[in-house]
């Protein structure tokens, strides 16, 4: 099902506002003789509105309503003048918003930041890419109460079934759950992927480009992929966190010879560093030759995976495809849910129009897809 409406959180989702928030709350509390706050302290205190941020930054013994009001006024005065000093969109976010607009998706923003600041930031950084912005408003409860998000959804003309709510905190996930919306947690913000999952995230995005297929195809159905792949004789294990996946792989590979093809997924899991203490590890970029073709276990990822049970890899030199067909005693594919698509054709499209352009750009290849992110079925010698 295609999604037609997006509701984004602001801080930690669209914009990295941490520096300006930290500077402003430090100004407000230092003015009254209290200790400055660090970036980390600011990060963990964000999410329930600026009053809560200020309150949590005042020492407990001085945390009266009067002092909170005074510091909050100082915070707002300073932040109003400095909210765009260090704030910036997360890399790739503007491109995602542009693509959503081109595809007819209506975008709104809901923030616990006070309304005038939220509107000013959205106007400055995103302009008409966002249709409507709501910040904290008088006499309307803040997130995770669903009142504001349901008002915003109504004004955007969306419906619950085709709307994604996207945010970086437990508050955001709870807001979506309370409103009956699909909750997408972004792992580049101020909270961990584990916290987002525990708070009700239906899916996670680890980089902005992960959001686009969620609008095209909806949230991937892991259970369908499991049924299809096990039906074809594959083993299947699902892990909610990176640490769980690493633990399983370490236990499975302990005492064995292991090799890996070119895989950014495996590098992100810490291969070979996380495995070298208990495993005879070989990586084809470092260890050339036959040994890498005849291990006990071969670890790889895939460019695409389908809910109908197909695994898609497109290789320049066939290092991964060949090793999965011949040589190793056992092959384990390690894939993020972001690679899962409804069917074979959409999995191939992911390989061509997401994986291949990203790899070409990463490897500094001068192919057309490295420029515009779309496969041209080119005859480039660097392909």
What are the residue ranges of the model-derived segments?
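Substrate-recognition element of Asp-dependent hydrolases with the DxDx(T/V) motif
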Residues: 13, 25, 93-123
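Substrate-recognition "cap/lid" segment bordering the active-site pocket of phosphatases
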Residues: 85-88, 114-166, 170-179, 184, ...
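Active-site neighborhood of HAD-like aspartate-dependent phosphohydrolases
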Residues: 1-44
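Conserved phosphate- and dinucleotide-binding cores of soluble alpha/beta proteins
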Residues: 297-383
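Helix-loop "lid/cap" segments that line or gate small-molecule binding pockets
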Residues: 28-29, 49-63, 121, 152-153
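N-terminal active-site beta-alpha-beta segment that forms phosphate/nucleotide-binding
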Residues: 222-299
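Metal-dependent phosphoesterase signature
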Residues: 32, 56-95, 103
């Amino acid at each position: 099902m295609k999604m037609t409406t997006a509701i984004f959180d602001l801080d930690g989702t669209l914009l990295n506002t941490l520096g300006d928030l930290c500077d402003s709350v430090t100004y407000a509390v230092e003015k009254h003789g209290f200790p400055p706050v660090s970036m980390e302290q600011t990060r963990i205190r964000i999410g329930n509105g600026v009053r809560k941020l200020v309150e949590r930054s005042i020492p407990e013994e001085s945390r009266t309503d009067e002092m909170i009001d005074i510091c909050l006024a100082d915070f707002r005065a300073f932040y109003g003048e400095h909210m765009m000093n260090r704030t910036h969109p997360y890399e790739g976010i503007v491109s995602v918003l542009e693509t959503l607009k081109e595809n007819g998706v209506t975008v709104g923003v809901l923030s616990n930041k006070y309304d005038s600041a939220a509107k000013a930031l959205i106007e400055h950084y995103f302009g008409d890419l966002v249709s409507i912005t709501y910040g904290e408003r008088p006499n309307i409860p803040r997130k995770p109460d669903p009142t504001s998000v349901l008002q915003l959804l109504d004004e955007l003309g969306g419906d619950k079934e085709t709307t994604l709510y996207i945010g970086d905190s437990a508050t955001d996930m709870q807001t979506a759950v309370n409103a009956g919306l699909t909750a997408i947690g972004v792992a580049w913000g101020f909270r961990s992927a584990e916290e987002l999952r525990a708070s009700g995230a239906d899916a996670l995005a680890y980089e902005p480009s992960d959001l686009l297929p969620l609008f095209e195809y909806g949230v991937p159905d892991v259970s369908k992929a499991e049924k299809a792949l096990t039906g074809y004789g594959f083993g299947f294990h699902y892990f909610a966190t990176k640490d769980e996946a690493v633990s399983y792989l370490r236990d499975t590979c302990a005492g064995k010879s292991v090799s890996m093809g070119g895989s950014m997924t495996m590098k992100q899991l810490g291969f070979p560093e996380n495995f070298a203490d208990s495993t005879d590890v070989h990586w084809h970029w470092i260890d050339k030759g036959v040994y890498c073709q005849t291990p006990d276990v071969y670890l790889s990822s895939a460019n695409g995976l389908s809910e109908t049970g197909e695994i898609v890899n497109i290789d320049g030199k066939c290092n991964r495809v060949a090793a999965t067909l011949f040589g190793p005693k056992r092959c384990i594919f390690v894939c993020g849910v972001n690679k899962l698509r409804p069917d074979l054709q959409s999995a191939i499209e992911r390989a061509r129009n997401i994986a291949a352009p990203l790899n070409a750009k990463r490897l500094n290849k001068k192919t057309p897809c490295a420029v515009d992110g779309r496969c041209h079925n080119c005859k480039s010698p660097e392909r």
